[in-house]
Amino acid sequence: MRHNQMYCETPPTVTIHVKSGSNRSHQTRKPISLKRPILKDSWEASENNAQNNKSKRPRGPCLIIQRQEMTAFFKLFDDDLIQDFLWMDCCCKIADKYLLAMTFVYFKRAKFTINEHTRINFFIALYLANTVEEDEEEAKYEIFPWALGKNWRKLFPNFLKLRDQLWDRIDYRAIVSRRCCEEVMAIAPTHYIWQRERSVHHSGAVRNYNRDEVHLPRGPSATPVDCSLCGKKGRYVRLGLSSSSSSSSDTGELMEKDSQELHSAFSVDTAGDPPHTYSQVANDHQSNKENETNFVKKNKSVEWFAESEE
């Protein structure tokens, strides 16, 4: 059985410790010795000092990933709306495996509780990841109608404020290394969200300005755009699709309720800076399905998260 805690190293930061002047004044100076040690002894001493310094050297900041946190993150993808959003992104330009791993890292850096693993927080973190990593600005705008519903044009300025609040909550540490993403994915490597590979021809900052204009965002009511590079029908495999279509009335009602909650969260006048407003936008309308998708049932790597604590 695997350990309950997994470690994922993040880019190290530099900490400078400065002693106060009062402490320096009371320090006794050691006499300077000019004796030259024997060469062999000095070589062994230098090796021992190097090993001691290496062992005493503080390690960089790390993420301690709890089992229940990863489980709560995976449960987000049981939501029909999020599944349909992934189905729409058939070329993995908005939510490939690295952007999804960054989303989880943001949840950790923000110290989200289990109750804060909500749909709206997922879209906010994913939008921030796209802002940091992607050079093509237009693609990420597709997140607006999925997260905010039909009134997204009125609500997206507030959505951007929530993104900035999340950025502040993670202490503006929005850069996530490739190694950190891969270590997060290595916890459950066969989960279907880590199979979302982006094709090479969709990588980089090279743009084709002669392409047919596609007005973005298109929203949940539209079908994925045919991609001549990925194939006319797009890549719909291994995305964890839901049985409901993206144009279902239930999905539309859920999005409308979420947009109303987001609007009401900003309509309240508060004195001072409200702590973590975006965490107050509760997602009470996620899917009521208790059964996981067939793919997750066959995914044995997730059993580690489903097992009870011994």
From Swiss-Prot:
<dbReference type="GO" id="GO:0070197">
    <property type="term" value="P:meiotic attachment of telomere to nuclear envelope"/>
</dbReference>
<dbReference type="GO" id="GO:0005635">
    <property type="term" value="C:nuclear envelope"/>
</dbReference>
<dbReference type="GO" id="GO:0008284">
    <property type="term" value="P:positive regulation of cell population proliferation"/>
</dbReference>
<comment type="subunit">
    <text>Interacts with CDK1, CDK2 and CDKN1B/KIP1. Identified in a complex with CDK2 and CDKN1B/KIP1, where it interacts primarily with CDK2.</text>
</comment>
<dbReference type="GO" id="GO:0070200">
    <property type="term" value="P:establishment of protein localization to telomere"/>
</dbReference>
<dbReference type="GO" id="GO:0000781">
    <property type="term" value="C:chromosome, telomeric region"/>
</dbReference>
<comment type="similarity">
    <text>Belongs to the Speedy/Ringo family.</text>
</comment>
<dbReference type="GO" id="GO:0007140">
    <property type="term" value="P:male meiotic nuclear division"/>
</dbReference>
<keyword id="KW-0217">Developmental protein</keyword>
<feature type="modified residue" description="Phosphoserine">
    <location>
        <position position="221"/>
    </location>
</feature>
<dbReference type="GO" id="GO:0001741">
    <property type="term" value="C:XY body"/>
</dbReference>
<keyword id="KW-0597">Phosphoprotein</keyword>
<keyword id="KW-0227">DNA damage</keyword>
<keyword id="KW-0131">Cell cycle</keyword>
<dbReference type="GO" id="GO:0019901">
    <property type="term" value="F:protein kinase binding"/>
</dbReference>
<dbReference type="GO" id="GO:0007283">
    <property type="term" value="P:spermatogenesis"/>
</dbReference>
<dbReference type="GO" id="GO:0000082">
    <property type="term" value="P:G1/S transition of mitotic cell cycle"/>
</dbReference>
<dbReference type="GO" id="GO:0006974">
    <property type="term" value="P:DNA damage response"/>
</dbReference>
<feature type="region of interest" description="Speedy/Ringo box; Required for CDK-binding">
    <location>
        <begin position="67"/>
        <end position="199"/>
    </location>
</feature>
<comment type="function">
    <text>Regulates the G1/S phase transition of the cell cycle by binding and activating CDK1 and CDK2. Contributes to CDK2 activation without promoting CDK2 phosphorylation, by inducing a conformation change of the CDK2 T-loop that obstructs the substrate-binding cleft prior to kinase activation. Interferes with CDKN1B-mediated inhibition of CDK2. Mediates cell survival during the DNA damage process through activation of CDK2.</text>
</comment>
<dbReference type="GO" id="GO:0005654">
    <property type="term" value="C:nucleoplasm"/>
</dbReference>
<dbReference type="InterPro" id="IPR052316">
    <property type="entry name" value="Speedy-Ringo_regulator"/>
</dbReference>
<dbReference type="GO" id="GO:0030295">
    <property type="term" value="F:protein kinase activator activity"/>
</dbReference>
<dbReference type="GO" id="GO:0016233">
    <property type="term" value="P:telomere capping"/>
</dbReference>
<dbReference type="GO" id="GO:0045737">
    <property type="term" value="P:positive regulation of cyclin-dependent protein serine/threonine kinase activity"/>
</dbReference>
<feature type="modified residue" description="Phosphothreonine">
    <location>
        <position position="223"/>
    </location>
</feature>
<keyword id="KW-0539">Nucleus</keyword>
<dbReference type="GO" id="GO:0005634">
    <property type="term" value="C:nucleus"/>
</dbReference>
<protein>
    <recommendedName>
        <fullName>Speedy protein A</fullName>
    </recommendedName>
</protein>
<feature type="region of interest" description="Disordered">
    <location>
        <begin position="241"/>
        <end position="310"/>
    </location>
</feature>
<dbReference type="InterPro" id="IPR020984">
    <property type="entry name" value="Speedy"/>
</dbReference>
<dbReference type="Pfam" id="PF11357">
    <property type="entry name" value="Spy1"/>
</dbReference>
<dbReference type="GO" id="GO:0048477">
    <property type="term" value="P:oogenesis"/>
</dbReference>
